[in-house]
From Swiss-Prot:
Origin: domain of life: Bacteria
One Pfam assignment: Glyco_hydro_3
Listed PANTHER family: BETA-D-XYLOSIDASE 5-RELATED, SUGAR HYDROLASE-RELATED
Species assigned in the record: Formosa agariphila (strain DSM 15362 / KCTC 12365 / LMG 23005 / KMM 3901 / M-2Alg 35-1)
Signal peptide start and end residues: 1-19
Matching NCBIfam families: betaxyl_Flavo
GO molecular function, one term: xylan 1,4-beta-xylosidase activity
PROSITE patterns: GLYCOSYL_HYDROL_F3 (PS00775)
Keywords from the named record: Glycosidase, Hydrolase, Periplasm, Signal
GO cellular component: a single term: periplasmic space
Protein name per its UniProtKB record: Beta-xylosidase
Documented EC number(s): 3.2.1.-
């Protein structure tokens, strides 16, 4: 009897535990959250609901609703109006993507999420999923992962998964909500002007700009989306129901909340001149599905989702209340998913808080090293042999930057927080070889000046050195949001500085620190070694030094084509066939090809590609196969190679791009080592948009190209037949 009683007690305990676990699971389910949100909505006043629809979604003490603090996280955490916390600043987006390793992007975002939580941030306005359109005059090029929709999709999904977490870890105490921006077609701007209108076909929208957002929603479950400043074919994105409802929500299945870009609901009045006042602008935004009004600094005179603007209109038109409830519900749902209702408010001492860790800063170095692209290396000038170098000139406006008294370093690029330190190229080289090599530093000129006053000192430094590291490019003074330009030359007198140093006859390594592809014809023709480093983050100088002296073999590849001249733009590898015959389809007196193509990058070693092979040379339209290629390191040092696969439907019912990237993989090979790299070929890789804009795989032949870059000479091909 006693045994039966004990067994009963154990069973009761077991089922109680199971019930509790099930209840816990259910309490966190979407259905349970919906019930909680509905209860709160029924208790909230109109004023309280409207207050919820602004950035930070402020706390409501009466109902126990927590706030949801925002920040930027493009390449590390930035608090937008504040610079504290000693946050880790990683390489800028264009640099991080140059690694061609999504897992590194994911790790960066995961570390950023931890730093965000440490500062009480739970909602970040990143990543930027804009596909670069090939017009480098546009200042925000640096925020993009590149010119290819597949590449941007892979990097974007990785970033979102890192920032938000996956599975049971999604939105937990170590992760935050990501925001995919700018929906959609933002870089298709006229004259390279930020926020310029986007006139394009629906085909181009779907082929180029929409895929990264589709992947963000369907694969990564992104929690928030931000529309672009611009209009799309005459209808501003912030009131564009076709984009925000029909495509984003109904077609893609997005179920998060939409946050405006800064002041953009208000700009329906002040920029687009559609709304006659802020109230009309607010109603247009609400009806289109914009849930949160971002006005940085919460300037009441710019806000649209504000009691003073909306309340009277809503009370006079009760039918509009459903839009208020809808927006508020989506924001409250996000707070529940983040677990904010159960968390204690975090008290931050801005004077002492330290968010970055040694682990994060070491990873920032690894990411910077893997992002560096070698564009040229005549006669194997690099790597330098420290035993043969007694003196080294370090010259250029971007060679060094002191800690700013206000804001953050200009050489980190846009959307950067303030790290505890920044390692410049000068710092990195001194640290690397300063005990054995005399470093002769001269600035030469300022990045945004036309004065040549510093030239004599720079020329002297070069003449008195065995070799020269010349660091030029751009900074946040000449690039970034609001940094649109009419030409792509090195700004100021930097080109003249390069010419002057070249005339000394000393071996020169040009290090580019920049945020956009530049027109660098003189450098490409006359300087033996060129390193593209973009904005390499807080450890940039260490990474550059490690590459220059051979401790790191550069393995990055371009994600953006370099134009020869501004007259070429837009320049990307995504081209359709040009007119052929009578010399047409070409520029007269100039080369229309890029100076450096998409996917290009050199190494201190060499690689040999075998002939690509298909598991099946013929498949059904709904079938799959695999293409494989052997890659061998034929050099003397270990190196990384990014193997790229491009696909073209040879003859189809609509015009297509000459080829499109559909797979890539970065591999490491020891000298003499061979690896086989394989890529899947199926619907996702072979489909096109037919005349009805539907994704289909059409019967016929497909050219599958595998190789080291998008350039035809770097690719080997095999033909696939689809029946």
């Amino acid at each position: 009897m006693k045994k039966l009683w004990l067994m009963g007690l154990l069973l009761a305990s077991f089922f109680t535990t199971v019930a509790q676990n099930n209840a816990q699971t259910k309490s966190n389910s979407d259905e349970e959250i919906d019930k909680k949100v509905a209860t709160l909505i029924s208790q909230m006043t109109l004023d309280e609901k409207i207050a919820e629809m602004t950035q930070d979604a402020p706390a409501n003490e009466r109902l126990g609703i927590p706030s949801m603090k925002y920040g930027e996280a493009l390449h590390g955490l930035w608090l937008v109006l504040d610079y504290y916390g000693n946050t880790t600043v990683y390489p800028q987006a264009v640099a991080a993507a140059s690694t061609w390793e999504p897992e590194l992007i994911k790790k960066m975002a995961s570390q950023t999420a931890r730093e965000a939580r440490a500062l009480g941030v739970t909602h970040c306005y990143s990543p930027n999923l804009d596909v670069y359109a090939g017009d480098a005059r546009y200042g925000r090029v640096e925020e993009s992962y590149g010119e290819d929709p597949y590449l941007v999709s892979r990097m974007g999904v990785a970033f979102i998964e890192g920032l938000q977490g996956t599975g049971e870890e999604q939105f937990d105490e170590n992760h935050v909500i990501a925001t995919a921006k700018h929906f959609v077609g933002y870089p298709e701007n006229r004259r390279g002007i930020n926020g310029g209108f986007s006139d394009m076909s629906e085909r181009r929208l779907r082929e180029v700009y929409l895929p990264p957002f589709e992947a963000a929603v369907k694969e990564a479950g992104v929690g928030s989306v931000m529309p672009g400043h611009q209009d799309f074919n005459g209808v501003p994105c912030h009131m564009n129901t076709w984009l925000l409802k029909d495509i984003l929500r109904d077609e893609l299945g997005f179920d998060g909340f939409i946050v405006s870009d800064n002041n953009d609901v208000g700009r329906l009045e002040t920029m687009h001149f559609i709304a006659e006042n802020r109230t009309e602008a607010a109603i247009l935004g609400l009806k289109a599905g914009v849930d949160m009004d971002l006005v940085i600094g919460k300037n009441v005179e710019l806000a649209t989702y504000h009691t003073n603007i909306l309340k009277d209109t809503i009370l006079k038109n009760p039918a509009l209340m459903k839009y208020i409830d809808q927006a508020t519900s989506r924001i409250l749902t996000a707070k529940y998913k983040l677990g904010l209702f159960d968390a204690k408010p975090k008290k931050i001492d801005t004077e002492t808080v330290e968010t970055g860790t040694d682990e994060h800063r070491e990873f920032a170095l690894e990411l910077a090293e893997k992002s560096i692209i070698m564009l040229k290396n005549d006669n194997n000038l690099l790597p330098l042999d420290v035993s043969k170098i007694k003196s080294l000139a370090v010259i250029g406006p971007n060679a060094h930057e002191e800690r700013p008294k206000k804001g953050t370093y200009k050489l980190l690029g846009g959307y950067s927080g303030l790290p505890p330190y920044y390692v410049s190229v000068l710092d990195g080289l001194k640290k690397k070889v300063g005990e054995h090599v005399k470093i002769n530093y001269a600035k030469g000129c300022d990045i945004d000046s036309f004065s040549k006053e510093g030239f004599p000192e720079a020329i002297s430094a070069a003449k008195n050195s065995d070799a020269v590291v010349l660091v030029v490019g751009s900074s946040h003074k000449t690039c970034g949001e609001g940094g649109d330009r009419a030409d792509l030359d090195l700004y100021g007198v930097q080109k003249e500085l390069v010419e002057a140093i070249h005339k000394t006859g000393k071996p020169v390594i040009v290090v580019l620190i920049n945020g956009r592809p530049l027109s660098i014809n003189y450098i490409a023709e006359n300087i033996p070694s060129i390193l593209e480093t973009w904005y390499g983050g807080m450890r940039a100088g260490d990474a550059v030094a490690n590459v220059i002296f051979g401790d790191v073999n550069p393995g990055g590849k371009l994600t953006m084509s370099f134009p020869r001249d501004v007259g070429q733009v837009p320049v990307t590898y995504l081209e359709r066939p040009d007119f052929i015959g009578s010399g047409k389809g070409q520029y007269r007196f100039s080369d229309k090809t890029p100076l450096f193509p998409f996917g290009f990058g050199l190494s201190y070693t060499t690689f040999k590609y075998g002939t690509p092979k298909l598991d099946n040379t013929s498949i059904a339209a709904n079938g799959t196969t695999t293409v494989s290629v052997e890659v061998t390191n034929t050099g003397k040092v270990t190196g990384d190679e990014v193997v790229q696969m491009y696909v073209r439907d040879d003859y189809a019912s609509v015009g297509r791009y000459l080829k499109m990237l559909k797979g890539f993989k970065r591999i490491t090979l020891k000298p003499g080592e061979t690896k086989t790299v394989s890529f899947k070929l199926g619907f996702d890789e072979l489909n096109i948009l037919n005349q009805d804009l539907k994704k289909v795989v059409e019967p016929g032949t497909f050219t599958i190209s595998v190789g080291a870059s998008s350039k035809a000479d770097d690719l080997k091909t095999v033909s696939l037949t689809v029946k």
